[in-house]
From Swiss-Prot:
<feature type="disulfide bond">
    <location>
        <begin position="38"/>
        <end position="82"/>
    </location>
</feature>
<keyword id="KW-0732">Signal</keyword>
<keyword id="KW-0929">Antimicrobial</keyword>
<feature type="disulfide bond">
    <location>
        <begin position="51"/>
        <end position="80"/>
    </location>
</feature>
<dbReference type="InterPro" id="IPR056373">
    <property type="entry name" value="Defensin-like_dom"/>
</dbReference>
<dbReference type="GO" id="GO:0031640">
    <property type="term" value="P:killing of cells of another organism"/>
</dbReference>
<comment type="similarity">
    <text>Belongs to the DEFL family.</text>
</comment>
<keyword id="KW-1015">Disulfide bond</keyword>
<dbReference type="GO" id="GO:0050832">
    <property type="term" value="P:defense response to fungus"/>
</dbReference>
<keyword id="KW-0964">Secreted</keyword>
<dbReference type="Pfam" id="PF24552">
    <property type="entry name" value="Defensin"/>
</dbReference>
<dbReference type="GO" id="GO:0005576">
    <property type="term" value="C:extracellular region"/>
</dbReference>
<keyword id="KW-0611">Plant defense</keyword>
<feature type="disulfide bond">
    <location>
        <begin position="42"/>
        <end position="65"/>
    </location>
</feature>
<keyword id="KW-0295">Fungicide</keyword>
<feature type="disulfide bond">
    <location>
        <begin position="55"/>
        <end position="81"/>
    </location>
</feature>
<feature type="signal peptide">
    <location>
        <begin position="1"/>
        <end position="22"/>
    </location>
</feature>
Amino acid sequence: MGSSRLMITFIVVAMLAISSDLFSVQIGISVQAAPPTCGRDCTEKFLTQDCDKYCVGLSYKKGVCILSEGLPPKTSTYRCCCS
């Protein structure tokens, strides 16, 4: 009788430990950041080199200033996009 209680307790503890690990893995996957859409504007002072440094600081490989056409009235601006 005592050994069966010990075995049941061991099984319950093992199941809780396994489910806890699976839960933490699921949380880690759901929290990962998605790549940003094109962010801040590129200007004469904030050029492609600055955009590249900005994106590398956000853990992306590179950044490029891309022409982004706005909605009417047409306001085209250069935006810093990370990839």
